């Protein structure tokens, strides 16, 4: 899964988080983006706020979608590894290396699933800030 900072690595959770951090840059800088691109009332004639807000909204949605796909892809990949390790453990329940690896993968899977919750909070925060500043200039389409 390609990401702005490189390839999303599902095997190493630290790298996975680092790439997500880079992918969340647009959300982290939403206030700055709005302050520098959406005019206040006194400067409203100099910039097309409707177009600016529309472009920013589209960028946000694209970033949210790509992160969601990346996280879900890694969850799917890690779930498959967990399933395979469970099968191996069922065949050989005394193999400590399989049991240890299974625990490690299960922990990683739980951490990746928790990233979906983090993603929801980040997205909600960004959209709240966006709506506070752009609601008079641009109304995004309703998400089905």
From Swiss-Prot:
Keywords: Coiled coil. Pfam families: MIX23 (PF09774). One of its GO terms (cellular component) is mitochondrial intermembrane space. Residues 82-120 form a coiled coil. Belongs to the MIX23 family. This is Protein MIX23. It comes from Danio rerio (Zebrafish). The gene is mix23.
């Amino acid at each position: 899964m390609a990401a702005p900072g490189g390839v999303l690595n599902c095997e190493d959770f630290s790298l996975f988080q680092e790439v997500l951090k880079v992918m969340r840059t647009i959300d982290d800088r939403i206030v700055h983006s709005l302050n520098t691109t959406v005019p206040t009332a006194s400067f409203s004639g100099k910039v097309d706020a409707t177009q600016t807000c529309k472009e920013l909204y589209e960028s946000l949605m694209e970033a949210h979608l790509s992160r969601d796909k990346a996280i879900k892809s890694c969850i799917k990949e890690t779930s498959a590894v967990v399933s395979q390790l469970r099968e191996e453990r069922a065949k050989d329940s005394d193999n400590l290396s399989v049991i240890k690896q299974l625990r490690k993968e299960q922990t990683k899977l739980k951490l990746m699933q928790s990233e979906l919750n983090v993603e929801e909070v980040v997205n909600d925060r960004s959209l709240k800030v966006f709506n506070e500043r752009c609601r008079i200039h641009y109304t995004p389409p309703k998400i089905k």
